[in-house]
């Protein structure tokens, strides 16, 4: 016997029929179509936006503003030591990090963090390095140029 393509069909209950609202009392969704009676949310067109509290000052305006996002943080990328193995060559700069797709194209600065191992001696040019990463780089025979 076997399975035939022309005999395939979805499982029982897999396909639900769409609810046709406003199509008679017997459907259970006739007349008001599940919207209730009167009020702003029963009207056609639009409803109240999310977070609207009926004219009362909403929560996001009752609470004070705090903090800020540093512009420098938005243009500085963090790179792990373990990710440096993807770089071809032994010089690490912003350009080589972008070429290896380790940082985004819009990043202007980079900082190397101590996470993982350095496999070969790299020369870092124009990149900030954390204290722990600096020790690991120098232990592997690498150097850091400001």
From Swiss-Prot:
One term of GO molecular function: structural constituent of ribosome
A single Gene Ontology CC term: cytosolic large ribosomal subunit
Cited Pfam families: Ribosomal_L27A
Keywords linked to the UniProt accession: Ribonucleoprotein, Ribosomal protein, RNA-binding, rRNA-binding
InterPro entries xref list: Ribosomal_uL15, Ribosomal_uL15/eL18, Ribosomal_uL15/eL18_sf, Ribosomal_uL15_bac-type
Biased composition (Gly residues): 24-37
Keyword presence, Nucleotidyltransferase: no
BP-aspect Gene Ontology terms: translation
Subunit note: Part of the 50S ribosomal subunit.
Function, in words: Binds to the 23S rRNA.
Family to which this protein belongs: Belongs to the universal ribosomal protein uL15 family.
Protein name per Swiss-Prot or TrEMBL: Large ribosomal subunit protein uL15
Originating species: Psychrobacter arcticus (strain DSM 17307 / VKM B-2377 / 273-4)
Gene: rplO
